[in-house]
Amino acid sequence: GAMARRRFIPIHDRGRVLIDLAVMLADGGESISDIGVLRHQSEALGPVASAPTVWRTLNEVTAGKRKKIQVARARTRRHVWSHLPGGVPASKCAGRDLGATIVLDVDATIVVTHSEKEHAAPTYKRTFGYHPIGVWCDNTTEFLAASLRPGNAGSNTAADHIDVLGQAIAQ
Protein backbone atom coordinates (compact mmCIF):
# COMPACT_ATOMS: atom_id res chain seq x y z
CA GLY A 1 0.00 0.00 0.00
CA ALA A 2 0.82 3.64 -0.30
CA MET A 3 1.46 3.94 3.45
CA ALA A 4 3.62 0.80 3.87
CA ARG A 5 7.00 1.05 5.59
CA ARG A 6 9.77 -1.52 5.39
CA ARG A 7 10.12 -3.75 8.44
CA PHE A 8 7.25 -2.02 10.24
CA ILE A 9 4.01 -3.88 10.83
CA PRO A 10 1.65 -1.61 12.76
CA ILE A 11 -1.31 -2.91 14.75
CA HIS A 12 -3.56 -0.64 12.65
CA ASP A 13 -2.84 -0.59 8.91
CA ARG A 14 -2.04 3.03 8.03
CA GLY A 15 -4.22 2.98 4.92
CA ARG A 16 -7.13 1.71 7.01
CA VAL A 17 -6.53 4.50 9.54
CA LEU A 18 -6.84 7.07 6.73
CA ILE A 19 -10.06 5.41 5.54
CA ASP A 20 -11.46 5.54 9.09
CA LEU A 21 -10.49 9.21 9.24
CA ALA A 22 -12.41 9.88 5.99
CA VAL A 23 -15.45 7.98 7.34
CA MET A 24 -15.26 10.01 10.57
CA LEU A 25 -15.25 13.28 8.58
CA ALA A 26 -18.14 12.12 6.38
CA ASP A 27 -20.03 11.24 9.57
CA GLY A 28 -19.69 14.84 10.78
CA GLY A 29 -16.52 14.58 12.84
CA GLU A 30 -14.67 17.84 13.33
CA SER A 31 -11.51 16.85 15.18
CA ILE A 32 -9.19 13.86 15.42
CA SER A 33 -10.65 12.95 18.81
CA ASP A 34 -14.00 12.29 17.09
CA ILE A 35 -12.48 9.08 15.68
CA GLY A 36 -13.61 7.41 18.92
CA VAL A 37 -17.23 7.61 17.74
CA LEU A 38 -16.44 4.99 15.08
CA ARG A 39 -15.51 2.43 17.74
CA HIS A 40 -19.23 2.04 18.43
CA GLN A 41 -19.51 0.73 14.86
CA SER A 42 -16.72 -1.84 15.17
CA GLU A 43 -18.97 -4.68 13.99
CA ALA A 44 -19.31 -2.90 10.64
CA LEU A 45 -15.94 -1.15 10.47
CA GLY A 46 -13.61 -3.47 12.34
CA PRO A 47 -11.06 -2.21 14.85
CA VAL A 48 -10.64 1.59 14.83
CA ALA A 49 -7.37 3.29 15.77
CA SER A 50 -7.02 5.67 18.69
CA ALA A 51 -6.57 9.43 18.23
CA PRO A 52 -2.80 9.20 18.94
CA THR A 53 -2.47 6.51 16.25
CA VAL A 54 -4.32 8.75 13.80
CA TRP A 55 -1.90 11.60 14.60
CA ARG A 56 1.09 9.29 14.08
CA THR A 57 -0.38 8.14 10.77
CA LEU A 58 -0.87 11.72 9.58
CA ASN A 59 2.71 12.55 10.60
CA GLU A 60 3.89 9.66 8.39
CA VAL A 61 2.23 11.10 5.27
CA THR A 62 5.24 12.49 3.41
CA ALA A 63 5.24 14.10 -0.03
CA GLY A 64 6.22 10.74 -1.53
CA LYS A 65 3.38 8.95 0.23
CA ARG A 66 0.90 11.66 -0.85
CA LYS A 67 1.95 10.96 -4.44
CA LYS A 68 1.38 7.22 -3.93
CA ILE A 69 -2.05 7.94 -2.43
CA GLN A 70 -2.92 10.13 -5.46
CA VAL A 71 -1.87 7.34 -7.83
CA ALA A 72 -3.96 4.80 -5.89
CA ARG A 73 -6.99 7.12 -5.93
CA ALA A 74 -6.66 7.65 -9.69
CA ARG A 75 -6.31 3.92 -10.34
CA THR A 76 -9.36 3.17 -8.18
CA ARG A 77 -11.41 5.90 -9.86
CA ARG A 78 -10.56 4.56 -13.35
CA HIS A 79 -11.54 1.06 -12.23
CA VAL A 80 -14.87 2.20 -10.77
CA TRP A 81 -15.69 4.43 -13.75
CA SER A 82 -14.99 1.55 -16.15
CA HIS A 83 -17.65 -0.51 -14.35
CA LEU A 84 -20.40 2.14 -14.30
CA PRO A 85 -23.42 1.01 -16.35
CA GLY A 86 -23.43 3.29 -19.38
CA GLY A 87 -20.09 4.83 -18.43
CA VAL A 88 -19.50 8.08 -16.60
CA PRO A 89 -22.78 10.01 -16.28
CA ALA A 90 -23.13 13.01 -18.58
CA SER A 91 -23.08 16.55 -17.22
CA LYS A 92 -25.61 19.12 -18.35
CA CYS A 93 -25.04 22.75 -19.20
CA ALA A 94 -27.96 25.08 -19.96
CA GLY A 95 -30.18 22.00 -20.22
CA ARG A 96 -27.93 20.34 -22.83
CA ASP A 97 -26.40 16.92 -22.28
CA LEU A 98 -22.61 17.18 -22.70
CA GLY A 99 -22.19 13.48 -23.49
CA ALA A 100 -18.84 11.91 -22.60
CA THR A 101 -17.19 15.24 -21.71
CA ILE A 102 -15.77 15.25 -18.19
CA VAL A 103 -16.61 18.59 -16.53
CA LEU A 104 -14.36 19.93 -13.78
CA ASP A 105 -15.92 22.39 -11.32
CA VAL A 106 -13.34 24.75 -9.76
CA ASP A 107 -14.42 26.74 -6.73
CA ALA A 108 -12.80 28.76 -3.98
CA THR A 109 -14.33 29.74 -0.66
CA ILE A 110 -13.48 31.54 2.55
CA VAL A 111 -13.03 29.45 5.69
CA VAL A 112 -13.12 31.68 8.76
CA THR A 113 -10.99 30.85 11.79
CA HIS A 114 -11.43 32.41 15.20
CA SER A 115 -7.78 32.46 16.17
CA GLU A 116 -4.45 32.60 14.44
CA LYS A 117 -3.87 29.23 12.83
CA GLU A 118 -0.89 28.18 10.75
CA HIS A 119 -1.00 29.92 7.32
CA ALA A 120 -4.28 31.73 8.12
CA ALA A 121 -4.42 35.38 7.02
CA PRO A 122 -6.85 38.31 6.72
CA THR A 123 -9.39 37.80 3.93
CA TYR A 124 -10.83 40.26 1.42
CA LYS A 125 -14.11 40.04 3.37
CA ARG A 126 -12.39 41.50 6.47
CA THR A 127 -12.36 38.18 8.28
CA PHE A 128 -9.43 35.91 9.18
CA GLY A 129 -8.81 32.43 7.84
CA TYR A 130 -8.16 30.49 4.66
CA HIS A 131 -9.14 30.76 0.99
CA PRO A 132 -8.94 27.15 -0.29
CA ILE A 133 -9.59 26.27 -3.90
CA GLY A 134 -11.04 22.88 -4.85
CA VAL A 135 -11.95 20.88 -7.94
CA TRP A 136 -14.87 18.46 -8.27
CA CYS A 137 -15.93 16.21 -11.13
CA ASP A 138 -19.36 17.55 -12.08
CA ASN A 139 -20.34 14.28 -13.75
CA THR A 140 -20.01 12.20 -10.57
CA THR A 141 -19.86 14.95 -7.88
CA GLU A 142 -16.52 13.49 -6.73
CA PHE A 143 -13.98 15.67 -4.99
CA LEU A 144 -10.70 15.52 -6.93
CA ALA A 145 -8.16 17.99 -5.55
CA ALA A 146 -7.69 21.04 -3.34
CA SER A 147 -5.15 23.61 -2.34
CA LEU A 148 -5.26 25.16 1.13
CA ARG A 149 -4.36 28.81 0.64
CA PRO A 150 -4.03 31.66 3.12
CA GLY A 151 -7.01 33.99 3.48
CA ASN A 152 -5.29 36.74 1.51
CA ALA A 153 -4.82 34.54 -1.59
CA GLY A 154 -6.26 36.13 -4.71
CA SER A 155 -9.55 34.88 -6.14
CA ASN A 156 -8.22 34.84 -9.69
CA THR A 157 -4.64 33.69 -9.16
CA ALA A 158 -3.90 31.79 -12.38
CA ALA A 159 -0.97 29.84 -10.92
CA ASP A 160 -3.17 28.45 -8.10
CA HIS A 161 -5.90 27.46 -10.56
CA ILE A 162 -3.42 25.78 -12.91
CA ASP A 163 -1.82 23.88 -10.02
CA VAL A 164 -5.07 22.53 -8.58
CA LEU A 165 -6.46 21.72 -12.04
CA GLY A 166 -3.28 19.78 -12.80
CA GLN A 167 -3.79 17.77 -9.61
CA ALA A 168 -7.44 17.12 -10.54
CA ILE A 169 -6.65 16.05 -14.10
CA ALA A 170 -4.09 13.58 -12.74
CA GLN A 171 -6.96 11.99 -10.85
What are these regions (language model features)?
Residues 1-154, 158-171:
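Dynamic "connector" segments at or just before major functional cores
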